[in-house]
Amino acid sequence: MNKILRGVIQFRNTIRKDLVKQFEEIKNNPSPTAVMFTCMDSRMLPTRFTQSQVGDMFVVRNAGNMIPDAPNYGAFSEVSVNTEPAALELAVKRGGIRHIVVCGHSDCKAINTLYGLHQCPKNFDVTSPMDHWVRRNGFASVKRLNERLHRGPSSMKFESEVAPSQSFDAIIDPMDTLAMEDKLSQINVLQQLINICSHEFLKEYLESGRLHIHGMWFDIYKGEDYLFSKDKKRFVVIDEKTVTDLLAELNARYPVPEDQDGPVAFAKSN
């Protein structure tokens, strides 16, 4: 708490004035362009590595950047009283955003826990909320990892029954350079995109092209951001050499609706 309180004092003496001014400027017309689901890991600073400013995007954080599959919440048609679907509704139906981003990262402690439980199920602690969280919501990702290990770096199909247009193919770690946990982390990001599609209240937005979902991955120790390219079927590092092609893919796949002006919101923010 000492560090937190002293940080508040530093904030008051440095950027507070400018930040309040920014709050005032967007007070009556906030216009976030995306909602990002990312991990609660203290090393993950999404507003820094995307250089987002006040009002640019919603950010939702939890252990392992997971958005549980709709059936995991309860009976069919049961209202989900949970953070993740509530955040999706707030951002999409009430906030009007057009882009959902799921951003995972390397050396993720939640994913490491999931992989550890997969390797040694007897270590599952029935009293641990964390163990229950990652096992329940990471099971599909573990199945995908097993598929990847069995088939090698070949294309895998990620399919959505609710929103078929959002299905895609992916090749995970084609050069086999990542640790097993990081392979699982990338798979987990893509599985969350399918999980998002499972929420019926988003179907009309997804199928009509009013809403788009994206997978990102951050390499903690290299400081490199990756975007999943549906054209290339893999995570592609975002740098000066690739950004033009990535933006071209985004604009081709997600054209701006006739009632909107300017470039794709997600592309514009990058």
UniProtKB/Swiss-Prot annotation:
<dbReference type="GO" id="GO:0004089">
    <property type="term" value="F:carbonate dehydratase activity"/>
</dbReference>
<feature type="binding site">
    <location>
        <position position="41"/>
    </location>
    <ligand>
        <name>Zn(2+)</name>
    </ligand>
</feature>
<keyword id="KW-0862">Zinc</keyword>
<comment type="subunit">
    <text>Oligomer.</text>
</comment>
<comment type="function">
    <text>Reversible hydration of carbon dioxide.</text>
</comment>
<dbReference type="InterPro" id="IPR001765">
    <property type="entry name" value="Carbonic_anhydrase"/>
</dbReference>
<dbReference type="InterPro" id="IPR036874">
    <property type="entry name" value="Carbonic_anhydrase_sf"/>
</dbReference>
<protein>
    <recommendedName>
        <fullName>Beta carbonic anhydrase 1</fullName>
        <ecNumber>4.2.1.1</ecNumber>
    </recommendedName>
</protein>
<keyword id="KW-0479">Metal-binding</keyword>
<comment type="similarity">
    <text>Belongs to the beta-class carbonic anhydrase family.</text>
</comment>
<keyword id="KW-0456">Lyase</keyword>
<dbReference type="InterPro" id="IPR045066">
    <property type="entry name" value="Beta_CA_cladeB"/>
</dbReference>
<dbReference type="GO" id="GO:0036498">
    <property type="term" value="P:IRE1-mediated unfolded protein response"/>
</dbReference>
<feature type="binding site">
    <location>
        <position position="108"/>
    </location>
    <ligand>
        <name>Zn(2+)</name>
    </ligand>
</feature>
<feature type="binding site">
    <location>
        <position position="105"/>
    </location>
    <ligand>
        <name>Zn(2+)</name>
    </ligand>
</feature>
<dbReference type="Pfam" id="PF00484">
    <property type="entry name" value="Pro_CA"/>
</dbReference>
<dbReference type="GO" id="GO:0008270">
    <property type="term" value="F:zinc ion binding"/>
</dbReference>
<feature type="binding site">
    <location>
        <position position="39"/>
    </location>
    <ligand>
        <name>Zn(2+)</name>
    </ligand>
</feature>
